[in-house]
Amino acid sequence: MKTLIRPFIYIMSALMVLSFTSCNDFLDKEPEGKVPEEKVDYTNISNMYQPVSGVYAKIRTSGLHWVIWEITTIRDQDVFSGQWNGSDYYNLSEYKYNDSFWGFNELWMQYYNIIKTANAAIESLDLYAENITNDSDMKNYKAYRGEVMFMRAYAYYRLVQAFGPVTILRDNNQVDLSRSTANAVNKYALEDLQYGIDNMPRIRPNQSEHKGAVTAFSAEMLAAKFHLNMGNYAKVEELTNDIIEHGNFSLYPDFYQLWKIPGKLCDESMFECQMTDFGNGSGDLIDGDQWFVCQGPNNSGSDISGWGDCGILKSFRDWAYARGETIRATTSFLLADSTTPDGDYIRAQVDPKKTDCWNGKAYTPLNQLTPGRTKYGTNNNARIFRYADVLLMNAEAKIKNGKNGDAPFNEVRRRAKMPELTNVTFQQVIDERRMELMCEWGERYNDLVRTGLAKTELKGWSEDKALLPLPFNQYTQIPDLLKEPKDE
């Protein structure tokens, strides 16, 4: 792991500086991190993975921006900003949007930073391919290209979830920045994913040559999530069946440790963003900046402390306890004035305007931190996609297709020590997703919107509030964004 990441520390430090040098990165035509072509020896095929590593790093520095995480999760039925204070963050949970809110612009820019970096990486890979002379290297080239296309599709997936119609940036010198419909963007991203499905190895990410790299099964999962949002249940069933039958994935047996250091890159992992402190108490550190910290509890005087954002509402906790949840509740609810299973005490919340419960999935115990490290969540990975979601998508698709979804559904419940159910219904799957995927990348909000349940489940929500507004900074500088989206 150390040898894979270290060569890119200094490269990506420079990229992080570049990403903050413009008030509107979407307008910049030159992709961040693109090494001038005359300085790269594209005949040296041994360096061909470097552009791919750069895109993974961009996922970490851009895709894990703390404000993106908060915008993505706060609209969930069960999560709020953590403070009852009328801020732009709090208003998200009441579906009141301000198009001048800097966070919306940041979300837009950072996902396009990923897309531009992916576009540049594909250009570089294609230049390497011109010098390939054997089948083995050509196979690697196609697999590496598939990894980059997966990450580009991932950025579009998040953009469509947030804004609906967005710009398809086919290359970094594109002049036409008008938007395409959500269906057109989905189709474009699915083409990327199909390339990955066809050319990446059919193994788990933790079996990859570059451990943790996405695989054909990761691409199938993301494709299934696109199709789930589009209501294409036959395709969801087909894709998730293949993962279940041939992917050799399994649920990590300990739900609590799944989110801790022991659960990094386990057999449940479909896609996660990797961090490391290289086993050292000081010095080089690759992390998600404030991604973990923003979710940490108000716990001054302890290294188990963060900003206190992303509060878990009591109404959801009551719902979970009424269901009989124990394992998932203990793991997911990091409660004030309580001691965790690892012995870390979380102080009582003295401010009634702030939450008294935080996301336990982002908690790394003190006894798992490398001695000398004190930053909340250091050396842990950010989980993005996991096999439990595949099982629940499969169950939902089977039920919608008139079949029985009990087997995949109950596989998830068994780990949580919840009673198995028979003749599982669609609503039971949606409820199971609510508990299992709590505070994971806005899954609850997405589920309610895509199924039409939002209008009855979300107070203050209406169809016209399903999507975030176009950022003011974008449409004022790029008037073409206000044109009617095209279906291409």
Could you say what each language-model-derived stretch is?
Residues 45-63, 84-162, 175-184, 193-205, ...:
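Conserved, well-structured interaction surfaces
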Residues 23-71, 240, 471, 479-488:
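Membrane-proximal, proline-rich intrinsically disordered regions
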Residues 1-32:
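Bacterial Sec-dependent N-terminal signal peptides
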